[in-house]
């Protein structure tokens, strides 16, 4: 979810050094309703030390979604979040 937000919706905007988004009223974060049903399977392996499993996939989310957009419509996006307006602009640039 966190990586999805970084890639698609979350952005703090600035103008002339001033923060335009000063509260969370307009800061859109992903909703659970956006996701398909996820089944979590935990595997007990006492020989393996405990470690985090949620953080590493966050790093790849932007690239994964950018490449999916490129494969779907041929628009190469290099800035996050990847909004519909940025996709349209990339399509116009060719």
Specify the residue positions occupied by each region the protein language model found.
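C-terminal catalytic domains of large/alpha subunits in multi-subunit enzymes
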Residues: 1-94
């Amino acid at each position: 979810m966190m990586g999805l937000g970084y890639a698609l919706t979350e952005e703090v905007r600035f103008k002339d050094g001033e923060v335009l988004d000063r509260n969370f009223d307009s800061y859109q974060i992903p909703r659970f309703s956006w996701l398909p049903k996820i089944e979590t399977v935990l595997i007990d392996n006492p020989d393996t030390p405990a470690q985090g499993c949620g953080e590493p996939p966050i790093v790849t989310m932007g690239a994964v979604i950018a490449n999916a957009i490129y494969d779907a419509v041929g628009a190469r996006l290099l800035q996050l979040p990847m909004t519909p307006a940025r996709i349209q602009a990339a399509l116009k640039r060719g």
